Curated annotation (Swiss-Prot):
This is Regulatory protein RecX. The lineage of its organism: Bacteria, Pseudomonadati, Pseudomonadota, Gammaproteobacteria, Pseudomonadales. Belongs to the RecX family. It is found in: Cytoplasm. One of its GO terms (biological process) is regulation of DNA repair. HAMAP family: RecX. Its main location: cytoplasm. It comes from the Bacteria. Keywords: Cytoplasm. InterPro entries: RecX_HTH_1st, RecX_HTH_2nd, RecX_HTH_3rd, Regulatory_RecX, WH-like_DNA-bd_sf.
Amino acid sequence: MSAVLDTPVAIRRTAMDLLARREHGRVELTRKLRQRGASDELIEPELDRLAEEGLLSEARYLESFIRYRSGSGYGPSRIREELGQRGLARADIEQALRESEVDWRERMHDVWQRKFAGQRPQDPRSRAQQTRFLAYRGFPMDMIGRLLSGRDLDDY
């Protein structure tokens, strides 16, 4: 049985429990607290307080999310879209992607290597299949084209 979130102390405790498990964005944390029965009038001041204390940080959340999703084999376009769906500001997302130290070409090459065992497409059908896969994963079309045509060979 879950506790009723009708006091600032209960909301703060629940928010800190959630933040102890992993970083959360403000919008995501608000949604989770609402689902547990907290009201917006009580949520906002507590989240403001957590942010002032440095316990709730959008920048840390962005960095953590980008590191996790890129490590799972997703590219910048897919990550950008997922963060946008989570209610984060487009400018903050773009800045976090620029500041991330992810080598997207290397990441795309690793994903392609795992999926297709390094076999470049021999016909239009297999090229389309590999292109769709990498595009779905969120890698830019120009990078995909260079990889599949072999123009990036000297980099790997």
